[in-house]
Amino acid sequence: GLGDVYKRQKYGCINVHASLLPAYRGAAPIQWAVMNGDEVSGVTIMKMDEGLDTGDMLTKVEVPLAADETGGSLFDKLAAAGAKLLVETLPKLEKGEVTPEKQPEISTTEYARMIKKEDGKIDWTKSAVEIERQIRAMSPWPSAFTKVNGKNLKIWDAKVIAMFGGDLFSKIPGQNPTKSAGKVWVADETGLHVKTGDGILVIEELQLEGKKRMKTADFLRGYAIEPGTRLGE
């Protein structure tokens, strides 16, 4: 069995995992760290066993996340950090200078399941902060997406300009967050200002199906999106 293969090696089989284990065991630790708004990620060099990312930990290094970190940029950072750490760890392991540390049974975060294309679909009833993180986490794949006038629209860059700490639109007569979520409030050279379940999100870079990726201001010169248009339909 696989366990026998691991045991036959002098030092076992070594894995480079893109999280600070036991957090984010699983296939997509990078995207989930960005999605959850973590400020720090990292790499763990670990011994493999028959479980999924449950083997003994050998060494770790922390890597801070930038405020505009994407899934792609964090992948690059962790790949570089992991390669450096692996090269440092292997000689120490051979000399007996590394003490394997058992992982706790329970992880400090949810299992980092594999990302599917559907994870990029935006739910406008979520807060602007959550959606902005989703957009960054899903870049470059599968990309965050919605619909506008029945066409698929990828969203590449956005920023939160207002958070209300509650349901601002429910306090306006005839409005509530669920009904107004996804509605374009402003469409001009500053971007598409979209109402969310909590707050306003400004879409600054996008890509309509069949078109190239572009700044929203440039896009709006050739494609009209009227205020009141609801995204996601």
Language-model regions, residue ranges each:
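Alpha-helix N-cap/helix-start motif
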Residues: 23-27, 124, 212
